[in-house]
Amino acid sequence: MPKSIEIFLRSLGGYLFMLVDVGKDIKSHGVSLRETSRHIIVIGVQSLPIVLITAVFTGMVLAIQTAYGLQRFGAKNYVGNLVGLALARELGPVLTAVMVCGRVGAGIAAEISSMMVTEQVDAIRALGGDPIRRLVSPRIVAGMISLPLLTGLAVVVGIAGGMAIAVTELSLIHISEPTRPY
């Protein structure tokens, strides 16, 4: 087996074991409300501006590009349906995850790495504490709470941005029928 695949599989296994440890810890001990709320602010509230700015411009660009593509077929009135579906199903969750991971992931990695270098994680273990419980579980729970809320807001703001462009620049004020589920 090539070395790179072996490294990937070992890393993936380590992540899965860590998630199992986090699940066991949350089930048996719960999480610290103070730490979790602090990380919700860091992960969710402080990521809100970059996520919403990205979403509104994505909705605007998506509306313009969709309108120009559909204009050739005389289906310009379906811009709203397509923008809404694209943002709700694909772009909203993906762009939110990319923005949050880019902003928060580097900070969390740097913070925990700094704690490893200064031996703070070893100090937690030496004092009888569990680093998973103190450092990892609150961050994972905060992410599980923050990311769906950020995604919902991103979808709504992206659709509003697309609607603003559709009404002001594309002169689309037609209210279309709801899209049928597939």
Cite the ranges covered by each PLM segment:
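Short, membrane-interfacial amphipathic segments enriched in basic
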Residues: 1-34
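Membrane-interface helix starts
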Residues: 27-53
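Transmembrane helix-loop junctions in multipass membrane proteins, especially transporters and channels
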Residues: 29, 63, 67-71, 106, ...
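Selective transmembrane-helix segments that form parts of the transport pathway or gating/packing helices
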Residues: 44, 48, 52, 91, ...
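Active-site cofactor/substrate anionic-group-binding motifs, chiefly glycine-
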Residues: 44-95, 99
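Mid-bilayer segments of alpha-helical transmembrane spans in multi-pass integral membrane proteins
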Residues: 60, 86-111, 131, 148-164
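Short cytoplasmic-facing helical segments at TM-TM junctions of multi-pass membrane proteins
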Residues: 112-140
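Single conserved hydrophobic/aromatic residue that forms the stacking wall/gate
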Residues: 173-182
